[in-house]
């Protein structure tokens, strides 16, 4: 069975992204932060103070993600922190899956649809690259429809 990790690794390789490339890893970190801000934007809180904190966090983290994705800032995980980073990334997967489970979201199917949509970003096996190295979307590309999975 091909895992989501394997599909993502193959997709990045097809896009010309290489393990150990400082620029590629920095852009990927920026993309990861951008996705987290998208998650934060879905949250609602029952206090004005909490809403302000979430809004500030979205603004600040979104700003940082854009700086990183554009190449204005280069970030990296130093070797002595990689075990901690791996643990945090795995914990992020576990807690994200837990949220989906508790909200009765069909994460298995959603993962496959999102990965299929990413595959559709390749045109004749080649990526559309944006300035800064982020993978773009070809004309006519559509995001995965997840509306029936919630």
Model-derived features with residue positions:
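Flexible "arm" and connector segments at domain edges
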Residues: 1-89, 93-150
